């Protein structure tokens, strides 16, 4: 069956990349605007017992990722049938409506249900990745996907700061309405600025899920990349629950603990913002597989000394360097995925990858909390380093066996 995508030359992929970057930036801001005060909003909805507050805060945070993991393959299949632009529009508008409803919620059960619906309707960033990956020339895909990844990262960095200021100035509920407005701007911008020439595929002509993997050049490698994506998120998420407490252990009872913890939490994102396009471009030249394995090993070498630091400054420096390495990982994975998948199934492959990413977002904090409860904060970094090391070794073995990269570039 002929691919549903038109030749690359008929589309201004540079313009689409810029607009998709802006969309990912706005989506990153929108999602992170409400994150700093989620527990406060749960409390506002009537959950006041400290134990219950912790439980509900964890539930409303994780349920979005759980439902996103479930829904992503469905939306990916629909994207391969109907096009990626319509999925961007569906995601932006759907999330905008849900954010309005969240601001109107009157009970914790309503809020929990809406967080689940948010996960079901989300997916702007993976669909943007699929759109750009299928339009950009293959020899520029590492740079393009690396640059695109900085949109969501930079939005997520700015969002909590703006969200905190807005919540202090206007209250908690208005921030949800402001977030909805940001997502609606993303919808309008995508509607009028993104161009995609896509020939819809009849449902009867669509490949079934098991057939998708038969079209891949190296199915085993793709499965390894899915697991790598999950472990990247596990490694990131495992540290999140204990970071503030670890900083307090290192610094003592300082007055500006929240500021110092927030700074240390955000520096990896700043480093990733700087490194992702550069390492993506380097990957286009020397191969994304080398970048992936090298940066996984660098991550291991940085995680281990984090368990030995004596003050917050040392931790901050190591986390900045870790962010620079991590900034190359997901773009390298995405580049390898598009090398191995045809445009015909790209939407589903990226959606499966998103499902594994969501699973990592859920399991990472659980692993970090469990390890710290049994062996202390420092053990979290050691255990995480071991998990990443296993993934680096397995990825290296799998990537060594894959076909020559030049044959992957031949379409």
Swiss-Prot record:
Q: SUPFAM superfamilies this protein is in?
A: MFS general substrate transporter
Q: Which GO terms describe its cellular component?
A: plasma membrane
Q: What is its main location?
A: membrane
Transmembrane annotation, as ranges: 17-37, 59-79, 92-112, 116-136, 147-167, 174-194, 222-242, 257-277, 291-311, 320-340, 379-399
Which molecular-function annotation in GO is an example for this chain?
Answer: transmembrane transporter activity
Q: Which family does it belong to?
A: Belongs to the major facilitator superfamily. DHA1 family. MdtG (TC 2.A.1.2.20) subfamily.
According to UniProt, the name of this protein is: Multidrug resistance protein MdtG
